[in-house]
Amino acid sequence: MATFKDACYHYRKISKLNSSILKLGANDEWRPAPITKFKGWCLDCCQYTNLTYCRGCALYHVCQWCSQYNRCFLDEEPHLLRMRTFKNTISKEDIENLLNMYDTLFPIHEKIVNKFINNVKQRKCRNEYLLEWYNHLLLPFTLQALTIQLENNTYYIFGYYDCMEQENQTPFNFVNLVSNYDKLLLDDKNFNRMAYLPPILQQEYALRYFSKSRFLDKPNRGLKRNDFSDNLMEDRHSPTSLMQVIRNCVAKHLDDSEWNKACTQVTNAKNYMEVMNSAYTEHYSVSQRCKLYTKNKLNTLSRLTKPNYILSNHETCALNVHNCKWCQITSCYKIWEDFRIKKIYNNVLDFIRALSKSNGMAGHCSSQERIYRYIPKLFLIYDEEQWTESVNSLFKCLEPVEISEVEYVLFDHEINWEVRGLILQCMNGSIPRILNLSDVRLILSSLIYDWFDIRYMRDTPMITSTTNELRKLNKKNELIDEYDLELSDIE
């Protein structure tokens, strides 16, 4: 059994404040919940189990039982998970406030210990101090935390997490923040708690404390596209669909600059109960536009590219080619439902085909040419070094002619109207008959940046913003984009 979950269950009964704060879905009756996908630690109850997605941030960090309360570590409402969540720089004072909150919610003194022992020893068979019966008294105060970096913020979710040696399939990683505090002072606090326990429980308490307070930080694997669930999409079949986010809020909005002081609210039980009584939910429709999602789409596009088209004689655009095994794309992939991807694919291949034909490259659909190997990488514009190298190699394959120490290639083949319009925009209103390497780079980048200008995108989706940030962006009408109207980034 998870120690933190057990402690919340038993300590709920000692006061009205605890009854309100320590209510976990994992300790309540199970309700229908979404299917699980990853193995990891539930941030709400701290147990290692199968995780499902959070309705507040789309990350997999909540178990099937706790999902019924829809709590997210990015919420505004000061529930237990939010009060255990700290952001960016953590001072010694912040940690002291956290430990004071723990001491308020999970006290150990003679009266509490005797009460729990008397509750357990109700039958003759329970005269021994079995660890299973006193698991809730074996919760040490540690500075063990799961951390994650979202955009420009680093979040630390403190708690007591069992089974640290288990496989972690989530983007959260363990860190030990004891160096931000006084190690000897933390030892002293735990030794004082241990003093009230029977000797056999003291031994187990000490073992748990030292194992969770002396470990080395675990490596951070970073965020991946699959770490975010698609279940928050309004329409899972639409690549431009908005994401529906639910956040728990309170009437008195707290400023993000005071983020790390949320745990101090438990010191005044009356005020805390008043704040919690004003709790409500806010719903936001948020764009999925960000570098993480865009990179995933461009990677898929690169993998599905059919470079043979650039030397073909098909009289239609690349995506409309049928009955040609060398040029016809596999249309079953969801990515082709995104009109932006279609436009980028058609326009880039149309431009490269015009360059190839202009410079006398002979070939056909089934021919094997060296230039083909560089075409898929032209879509990976987020990797500047690889993309530049691919453009340079492609330019060399066109056998440029040197004029006044500058190499040029011909450009006199027909192109479609969209490519023509984009070239007019980036080449000062004219379409040159010869292009140098710099011109080719500019045109190729413009064809992609027209729809995915990755230079100005967030790293992670906006659903990872704090509730205050979402509220501010919503007032400015900046949570959604204009892609549904087929307006590009440039427009």
Swiss-Prot record:
Stretches the record annotates as RNA-binding: 1-81
This protein's GO CC annotations: host cell cytoplasm; host cytoskeleton
Q: Does the keyword Nucleotidyltransferase apply?
A: no
Return the annotated region ranges for Zinc-binding domain.
42-79
Purpose: Plays a role in the inhibition of host innate immunity by inducing the degradation of key host factors required to activate interferon production such as IRF3, IRF5 or IRF7. Associates with components of cullin RING ligases (CRLs) including CUL1 or CUL3, which are essential multisubunit ubiquitination complexes, to modulate their activities.
Subunit notes for this chain?
Interacts (via C-terminus) with host IRF3; this interaction leads to IRF3 degradation. Interacts with host IRF7; this interaction leads to IRF7 degradation. Interacts with host CUL1 and CUL3.
Could you say which residues form the signal peptide? none
What species is this protein from?
Rotavirus A (isolate RVA/Cow/South/Africa/Offal agent/1965/G8P6[1]) (RV-A)
MF (Gene Ontology): metal ion binding; RNA binding
Q: Where is this region: Interaction with host IRF3?
A: 320-491
Entry comment, domain topic: The integrity of the zinc-binding domain in NSP1 is important for degradation of host IRF3. The pLxIS motif targets host IRF3 for degradation; however phosphorylation of NSP1 pLxIS motif is not required for its activity.
* Motif stretch (pLxIS motif): 485-488
Q: What compartments host this protein?
A: Host cytoplasm, Host cytoskeleton
Spans annotated as Important for cytoskeleton localization: 82-176
One Gene Ontology term from the biological process aspect of the record:
symbiont-mediated suppression of host cytoplasmic pattern recognition receptor signaling pathway via inhibition of IRF7 activity
Provide the alphabetized UniProt keywords.
Host cytoplasm, Host cytoskeleton, Host-virus interaction, Inhibition of host innate immune response by virus, Inhibition of host IRF3 by virus, Inhibition of host IRF7 by virus, Inhibition of host RLR pathway by virus, Interferon antiviral system evasion, Metal-binding, RNA-binding, Viral immunoevasion
Is Cell inner membrane one of the keywords UniProt gives this record?
Answer: no
Recorded family membership: Belongs to the rotavirus NSP1 family.
Q: What is the protein named? A: Non-structural protein 1
